[in-house]
Regions:
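Intrinsic disorder at enzyme termini
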Residues: 1-13
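Glycine-rich flavin
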Residues: 25-118
Length: 118
């Protein structure tokens, strides 16, 4: 499938691409860039860089610590991360537990569980 991006999406893609190029300086070993297992320190460094940028939870609403991206932005990020050889985001907490707590949890549960997932 070939997508045609509008100007804002192209600007976002360029921003993500620049971020990936900058973060290629992280201590991600050659094995990690080729899909091999990451060390704990590599995972922490990558997640820290994403968290500092506000990109650790692309699909989450901003009010809960996420980036609040739409599906096209998520696709652009995933595509650029893959092209740059960067590791995938962790799935379970960000994609399953967090969204359930955001949707069904009360304020206490959101306060208690969402921060640690990030």
């Amino acid at each position: 499938m070939q997508l045609t991006y509008d100007e804002d999406q192209i600007a976002f893609r360029d921003e993500v691409r620049a971020f990936m190029a900058d973060k290629a300086q992280l201590a991600l070993g050659e094995d990690a860039r080729h899909g091999m297992h990451l060390t704990k320190d590599e995972v922490i460094a990558w997640h820290k860089a994403l968290a500092e940028r506000g990109w650790i939870a692309p699909k989450w609403p901003v009010e809960h610590g996420g980036a609040g991206w739409d599906p096209i932005q998520v696709h652009i990020f995933d595509e650029e991360a893959f092209a740059a050889g960067m590791p995938r985001l962790p799935n379970f907490g960000l994609n399953y537990v967090g969204p359930v707590v955001i949707h069904f949890g009360d304020d206490w549960q959101k306060e208690r569980f969402l921060g640690p997932i990030l």
